[in-house]
Amino acid sequence: ACYALITDLKRLGMLDDTLVVWGGEFGRTNYCQGKLTRENYGRDHHPRAFTTWMAGGGVKPGITYGQSDDFGYNLTDRDGNVIKPNMDHWTKDTMHVHDLNATILHLLGIDHRKLTYRYQGRDFRLTDIHGHVIKDIIT
C-alpha cells in the first residue's frame, strides 16, 4: 500500500507537494522480558532506537540518516561508537524525536520555535527546547 501511494503521488505529479511520514513514537526491544509464551512475547517500548521513513514534500530520496548498533538497541555514530543522547548538546548524524518533529514542521512551513502553548504557567513546544531541523535530509 505504501509503494502504491508513493507511486501514484509521483505519477500524478503530487509527490513534491505531499509529505508522507511513516513511523511511530518508539521502537521495540529485540529481546524478551520474562519467559516467552503465546501470551507474553516480551517486546517492550524502546525509545532509544526507532524507525521512520519519509517521502516527497522536500525530503531527499534514497538516504539513510542515523544508525543503531547491531542489536538495534543504542544509537551509534558512523564508526559504530555508542552515543548517549545529550539534550544539552546536539550530535551530528543522530536524530532525537524532537529533531524529527522540528524537521517535519519545517517541511510543512511551520517554525517549530514559534509553535508554543502555555499550560499551568509554563511555555511548551512539541520540539521542547532541544529540537533541531535536520537539514541533511532536506532537498
PLM features per residue range, with description:
Residues 1-139:
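Ligand-binding pockets and gating/stacking loops
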